[in-house]
């Protein structure tokens, strides 16, 4: 894919800059970040943000068929903490930030205890959560978030019930 190609070329460029000019960097790969102030509408909206918006507007949650697409979701607090740790390390490393748990999109929708509507499959839909792998001499340091998606969604729903 163009995305994978670009990512590969950018990594290659960073490695060359490090070799030629002693350039310092930390590369961090994010996986489905969610949390307060996430984007809830539009092309850049997150899955969790879209579901929150649909829930708040009392609309059915839309899940792209077949719903078995799996993803790893990482809370923004975990993401920021690990970014800070990587910045402090200052070691020209590659990091992947995710959660150990993977959920299908349908499982996530069901966490909201709301009506679900299945929509047509999309071209180019990714069906599995793919953790980044680099095929050069560089190994990705996998970091896992501590905050759990189920707890976040449960807290979101409880806080909305208090508003009523």
Features from the language model and the residues they span:
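Active-site helix of classical SDR
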Residues: 6-9
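C-terminal substrate-binding subdomain of Rossmann-fold SDR/epimerase-dehydratase oxidoreductases
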Residues: 56-164
């Amino acid at each position: 894919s163009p995305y994978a190609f670009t990512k590969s070329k950018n990594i290659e460029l960073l490695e060359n800059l490090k070799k030629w000019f002693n350039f310092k960097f930390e590369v961090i790969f994010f996986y489905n970040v969610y949390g307060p102030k996430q984007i809830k509408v539009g092309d850049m909206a997150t899955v969790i943000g879209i579901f929150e918006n649909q829930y708040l507007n009392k609309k059915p949650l839309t899940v792209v068929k077949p719903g078995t697409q799996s993803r790893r979701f990482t809370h923004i607090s975990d993401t920021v903490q690990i970014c800070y740790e990587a910045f402090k390390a200052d070691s020209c490393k590659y990091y992947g930030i995710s959660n150990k748990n993977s959920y299908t999109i349908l499982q996530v929708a069901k966490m909201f205890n709301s009506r679900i509507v299945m929509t047509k499959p999309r071209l180019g839909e990714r069906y599995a959560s793919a953790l980044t792998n680099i095929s050069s001499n560089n190994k990705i340091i996998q970091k896992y978030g501590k905050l759990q998606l189920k707890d976040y969604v449960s807290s979101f729903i409880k806080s909305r019930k208090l508003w009523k």
